[in-house]
Amino acid sequence: MSEQIYGIHAVNAFLANAPERLIEVFVLKGREDKRLNPLLDELQRLSISVQQVNRQTLDNKAQGEVHQGIIARIIPQKELNEYDLNELLQHKSNPLLLILDGVTDPHNLGACLRTADAAGVDAVIVPKDKSATLTAIARKVACGAAEAMPLIRVTNLARTMRELQDKHQIWIVGTAGEATTDIYTSQLTGAIALVMGAEGDGMRRLTREHCDQLVSIPMAGSVSSLNVSVATGVCLFEIVRQKLSR
C-alpha cells in the first residue's frame, strides 16, 4: 500500500526527512523550474525513480489539487499512538503540546502542523475519531512540517489528557470564546498542552471538562472568531513569548 504527496515543498521536505520511504516521483515533462532542478538532482543521486509525464496525468493523480508539477508515491508512515507519546515525553522537560479536538479539514490540519513546527511544539495530538487524516492535501499545506512534527492519534482523548496531567504534570489550556480570562493575561509557562476545538463547535464537552484552564482570544472587530489555524498561531506564539521572557 502506498500514499502520494505533491508540491515542491512537500516532496523536498519528504526527501530531506524520509528518503527511504520515497518509491517514485512523477514530474511534468519539459518543465523548467529553478526550484525543481536541485530536487531532481538529489533524487537522481539517491537512485529514486523519476518519470516524466504530461500535465493530464499529474492532474488526474492530484485529483484537482495544485501539484506544482511534481507528485511522489511514498510508503506510509507508522501511525503514532499513546505509547509513542509517553516515550517522547520521557525525554522532554517543559514540553509544549498541541491538541486538536474535532479539526476535520485537512487544510486546517496541515496549517496547524506548520504553525506547530514553527513554534517549537513537541507533538500534535488528535483523536482517532472526528479528526482529519494526514492526506496529500494536509502534507502540501504543512510545507514539510508533516514529516518533522510527531502526529499522535489517540483512542480516548479525555483519558490521554488525564494522563498528561497526572503522569507528566502538564497544564492543559483550552480555548473558548466565552472564557472570561484572555490568553494575554494568563500565565502560560512550564509544561503546557494547548487545546484547540473545531471551528464553530469548539471543544467537545468532555474535552473542555478535562482542561485545567480556559482562555479566549480578545476580538476587537466585527467577526466573532478566527480560523482554527490562525487562532492556533496566536495562542502558540503567545505561549512561546512567555516562555522566552521568563
From Swiss-Prot:
SUPFAM superfamilies: alpha/beta knot, L30e-like
InterPro entries on file: 23S_rRNA_MeTrfase_RlmB, Alpha/beta_knot_MTases, Ribosomal_eL30-like_sf, rRNA_MeTrfase_TrmH, SpoU_MeTrfase, SpoU_subst-bd, tRNA_m1G_MTases_N
Binding site for S-adenosyl-L-methionine: G197, I217, L226
SMART domains in UniProt: SpoU_sub_bind (SM00967)
Alphabetically ordered keywords of this record: Cytoplasm, Methyltransferase, rRNA processing, S-adenosyl-L-methionine, Transferase
CDD domains recorded: SpoU-like_RlmB
Principal place of residence: cytoplasm
Superkingdom to which the source organism belongs: Bacteria
Free-text function comment from the UniProt entry: Specifically methylates the ribose of guanosine 2251 in 23S rRNA.
Membership in a protein family: Belongs to the class IV-like SAM-binding methyltransferase superfamily. RNA methyltransferase TrmH family. RlmB subfamily.
This protein's name: 23S rRNA (guanosine-2'-O-)-methyltransferase RlmB
Gene symbol of the encoding locus: rlmB
